[in-house]
Curated annotation (Swiss-Prot):
It comes from the Bacteria. This is NAD kinase. GO terms for cellular component: cytoplasm. GO terms for biological process: NAD metabolic process; NADP biosynthetic process. NAD(+) binds at D73, G74, N147, D148, R175, D177, T188, A189, Y190, A191, L192, S193, A212, Q246. Pfam families: NAD_kinase, NAD_kinase_C. InterPro entries: ATP-NAD_kinase_N, ATP-NAD_kinase_PpnK-typ_C, NAD/diacylglycerol_kinase_sf, NADK. It comes from Polaromonas sp. (strain JS666 / ATCC BAA-500).
């Protein structure tokens, strides 16, 4: 039985060692499954894979019905932000480190992908975040994020003071090294390192996690993603904001960063029988050494 996905885009972590040969092998495998393969244009130009058609993100959105990402979670997040508006499902083959969302082991990709291409998979939809920076009433920066929005102090010593509001209601002023607003997907990333909780992907919420707060009672809090969170820069030098891998290097006093749920979702496809808890056990090394 041939693939249910006729047109497949291949996106790679092209800086990784051996990426060209890995991508070429996967492309040829997809061809044997009845798929027409196109290579994302940056991947093609950086690996020299010119024997296949090349497409930019808009072209993938218009012509492909599946995107196969070979790399780590960062590679997946980068292309996923561009493709979310088109509703293209994403499958991840891990060539990074942890691989929470690029969950197919490279050495197993053929055996794992064959049934998935026939339609045997678990679909996992996750809401994105839409953020903007408002200065003197004018938007000076906007971005979408899948993992988190982070406001933090600059390279100089000293904390930042941040005023936090939810739906226009004052929550608190926080003096800290920064503040993380993380989605359930991002709760396994920087937010986890800063002491935040894990949020199951099905939870329609976010977690606010202070980074090294001066007041020890400033603890992480879980909020609904149906509202809008605003963080205002009250004090501190050289503060910056990061939206996944996108940055605004300099924030000024009075700048307001607002975060709300995006209208777009990322669609991840996992092997049949996939479990979020299996992923946590494996990636976070739970129960290792337990008989």
């Amino acid at each position: 039985m041939k693939s249910q996905f006729r047109h497949v885009a291949l996106i790679g972590k092209y800086h990784a060692q051996g990426s060209r040969s890995a991508l070429e092998d996967i492309a040829h495998f997809l061809g044997t499954q009845g798929c027409d393969v196109a290579i994302e244009q940056d991947t093609a130009s950086n690996t020299g894979l010119t024997q296949f058609p090349t497409l930019d993100a808009a072209g993938i959105g218009a012509q492909c019905d599946l995107a196969l990402v070979v790399g780590g979670d960062g590679t997946m997040l980068g292309i996923g932000r561009l493709l979310a508006q088109f509703g293209i499902p994403l499958v991840g083959i891990n060539q990074g480190r942890l691989g929470f969302i690029t969950d197919i082991a490279f050495e197993d990709y053929q055996d794992t992908l064959k049934p998935m291409l026939r339609g045997e998979f678990e679909e996992d939809r996750r809401w994105m975040m839409q953020a903007k920076v408002v200065r003197d009433g004018r938007c000076v920066f906007s971005a979408t994020a899948m993992n988190d929005v982070v406001v933090n102090r600059g390279a100089t010593a000293g904390m930042v003071e941040l005023r936090v509001e939810v739906d226009g209601r004052f929550v608190a002023n926080q003096r800290a090294d920064g503040l993380i607003i993380a989605s359930p997907t991002g709760s396994t990333a920087y937010a986890l390192s800063a002491g935040g909780p894990l949020l199951h992907p099905s939870i329609p919420g976010w977690v606010l996690v202070p980074i090294a707060p001066h007041t020890l009672s400033n603890r992480p809090i879980v909020l609904s993603d149906a509202g809008e969170i605003t963080v205002e820069i009250v004090a501190g030098r050289d503060a910056s904001a990061n939206f996944d891998m996108q940055s605004l290097a300099t924030l000024l006093h009075g700048d307001r960063i607002t975060v709300r749920r995006s209208e777009h979702q990322m669609r991840f496809l996992h092997p049949k029988g996939w479990s979020y808890f299996d992923t946590l056990r494996k990636k976070l090394h739970w129960n290792e050494g337990v008989a």
